[in-house]
Structure formats: C-alpha cells, structure tokens
C-alpha cells in the first residue's frame, strides 16, 4: 500500500476533551473518527487492526468446532418481552417502532434470537453439542459514553452460543471456551486476568470475566501478588483467584456526627437504625518488623463490623506478627486519643490492610479516631484511599475460599470478555423446544452457554498497554502494517526511488506481508512521526547516504534502535525479523 493512495488521517494533537490515552491515540493515528456521542467511523488503519483481531478469533473458534453465523441487529420486541428483558434490561435497550407500529429493539446481545433459531430447527440429539458464533455490530444506549470505544454506544462483538444435551457437555464446552479465550488474548498480546463474576442482565448460574489491566479501567481487581503470573486458572487454582472489587456509587456526603454516649457498635446501630454490615471496625495489631528501639511497628486491619478476623488467614500474611497480638486499649488511646470503639481507617497514622469485603463497600460508617464522633457516608477513593487488600474475615458460608497467596494488589481493569453458563433460562421460553423435549425418547434436556468478546474495546485496551511518547506500539500480529518503507527525498533522488520500489516489490512477492511505502512529498520528520504514531513495528529507511555504502537502515519500533543492513542481505534479514515475529 502507498501512502499517496491511502487515507492516513493522522493528527498532530488530540481534541482537548479526550482523557483516555487510547482515545487520544486512536484519533491522532487515524484509526477512528467520532460521528456522534458514542458512535465512531473506523478508518482504514483502524479497520486493518480490527480485521486482524477478528481473524485470530475466527481461527481459534474454528479449532473448537464453532460455526460462524450472522443474525440481524434489529430484533422483534416479542422475543425480549418473552424473556422479561424488555423491561428488565433497562434504558440501555434501544426500542423503536417501524411504519406498521411494530416494536423492535437494536440488539445489545442475541440470546433470545439464537435460542429461538436453534429451538425451531429439527435436530437429533447426536448433533449436539452445537456451537455457533457471530462477529457483529451491537448497540447499547449508554447514558454517558466515554473513553472513546471503551464505553461506546455502538460496538463490535464476538458473541458465541453453545447448546448441549446435558450439564456435563456444557461444562466441557465452557472449559474449552475458557482456554480458547486464553489463547486468543495471549496471541493478541494482552496482559489480563480472569475473575468469577455475577451473571448480570444476561443471567445464568456461572460466569467468568476476562479483565485486561489498564490505568483507565472502570473495574477494580484485587489480584494475588504472584510474580509473573497474570493467568489464573479457576479450575486448577481455586485457592488463588483475582477478586473483582466493585465499590458501589457514592450516595451520601461524608459527615462527622457526634455520638458522645455511644460505647459500642451495637449501641450505634440501635441509635441510628442502620444495618450492622454498613459499619466497619478497625483492629490494631503488631507488625512483623520492629523499630530501632526494638518495639514492634503497628498495622490496622479493617473488616466489616459483623465479621470476625480469621486467624488462619492472618497467619498467611507476612506483614503481621504471629502469634497475633492486638494492642491494649491504653495504647490505642495514646495513638488516637480515643476509645477503641472509635477507631477508624481515616487519618490513622499506621499502614492499613483492608478486607476485600470492606473494599467493596460504599457509604459506610467508621470511627473517627476522635472522642465521641463517627464518620458517616464514607466512600473509597473519595474519602480514603486503599493500597493493600487481603482476605481477612472468617468464612461463615460454604462457598467462600481461603486464599493461600493472601496479600492482594489492586489494579484497574477493563472487561474484554465474558463467558456464561445459562442453563435452560432462554430455551424454556420456546414452546416447540419444550414439546420436543417431552416427546424425545432420549429425554433431551438442553443446556445453553454464551461467550462474548468486545472486539472494538480490545483495540483500545491494547493501546492502553502498548504506547510511548511517539505513538502506538502494536504487537506485530495485529499491527495495521508489518513494515513501513520510508524513502528519503525519493522525488529528488532517482537512486532512492528505484531501490525503494525494488525492495517494495520484492518483499510483497517473497514475504507477502502488509507493507506501507511512504511515497508522499513530505519532510522526513513528518514521515517518521506519522509512521511512529500509527505504530508500524518494522521500519526501513532508504537514503542516498546509506545507499552510498550499499546499505539501508532498519528500526524496530519498540526498541527505537537503528541498524545498518547490507542490501544483499536485506531480504533474508527481514524474513528472519518479520516472519518469525
């Protein structure tokens, strides 16, 4: 491809209202242009990246026997009314009527439609399991689109659906899809983790989210501090799983309220008529390390008021002195000047370790470390920051876990994929399925799974994880072009022009890769800046100066280091560099 025939569409500066670095670079590098709030046109450079990601997904889906289909984005309202999501999905579901006054929706997802399609087909039990998927445009009427394509109204998803004759078959496909998602995201070059999640508006019994690390992420994940291990398998390592931290939106303003006669949490609960789980308590313990004077330093442990500290879990935290040693009330008064029941995490002059259940709370009540006063309406990030989260509380229900790698670190993340076990939630909506099930001699009891990947969002996430001051640093496998050729002053130098054209033609025929030759009449600085900005990983620079020594210059974008390559060795060198990457 020649830049003279290409819509490069680069910008020197991003619009001032763009806050996310991915949004800025996608606009500056000419990947997208905004049409309206939450709506974007994909320009040629962005579309090339998009198609490469889609093809990787198609390759991996094909390996597990998934079949591609295409369903309409416009769906009849009757399907959504039957499932209950016509009202249950909320205002993000865009509803409209056609000229015949019939109701429709723009589909944010396709569970209702695909389940009806499969249930209408006359299929034998031997044809199951069946996996279908599509790569298609979706629409979600976001109240406040933001961060470019990370939170857009229109987006492209891979949504897959599987159908099974029993739960065991569903579990097998679920496990295969789980591993396939690992493969896809690893091939793309993402740094991510997996968390067990709530099914949300889609529903079902079991679901897992794939979360990519990003400073601009809207989700918070507490991840066990395990070096070089960003991939946690929920089956093989149930004791070491990331935890999704989702503090609820703050409703109240923090207030300091006097309660001079209160001497316990129970009295506070009774006076203010609030549930006990809305209160936190702070316990000061001795740390493992000592001061110069041989006294132990101190730590504050913060848990819900209705929870107890787990001695078993505490023993796994290396910062805490074992056996556990809580300080006496007299020492607490020396530190805070207040009674133990008034201890709280705000303005406490010692390090804190916070139970992950507390990290998810909003508008909670805590001691103020001041005599006779409590903070009401406390919220994380607004009123107090947390840096260290751990699993501290005693297990009181059967499905909790003990995390052997107990200290957790908090990361902002963006959801890039989600898989669900739906069971029979959508299949039971269809009368013909129920009739077939009752009449079938094999007593078919179909189960359903669904599996999504946010493709357009992934591009933004990759940029969030791969950029420098000059632009995007694409992983080779999804770069819009593998190689850029920059001929310096090619319109003044016949030699430069001829060599550049010869190399371009040879590489196209020998290697067959995507190449962009910059044949514009531009200053070299502009050409270098544009190629770096759009993130082409391999760059050839051809000039009279280098050709005088029968050489060209090669730069690998991520290392930004120039190498001189002899012309006779160039093709072999590039094959080794590019094809093997």
From Swiss-Prot:
It comes from Blochmanniella pennsylvanica (strain BPEN). Catalyzes the attachment of proline to tRNA(Pro) in a two-step reaction: proline is first activated by ATP to form Pro-AMP and then transferred to the acceptor end of tRNA(Pro). As ProRS can inadvertently accommodate and process non-cognate amino acids such as alanine and cysteine, to avoid such errors it has two additional distinct editing activities against alanine. One activity is designated as 'pretransfer' editing and involves the tRNA(Pro)-independent hydrolysis of activated Ala-AMP. It catalyses: tRNA(Pro) + L-proline + ATP = L-prolyl-tRNA(Pro) + AMP + diphosphate. GO terms for biological process: prolyl-tRNA aminoacylation. PANTHER family: MITOCHONDRIAL RIBOSOME PROTEIN L39/PROLYL-TRNA LIGASE FAMILY MEMBER, PROLINE--TRNA LIGASE. It is an enzyme of class 6 (ligase). Homodimer. This is Proline--tRNA ligase. Keywords: Aminoacyl-tRNA synthetase, ATP-binding, Cytoplasm, Ligase, Nucleotide-binding, Protein biosynthesis. The gene is proS.
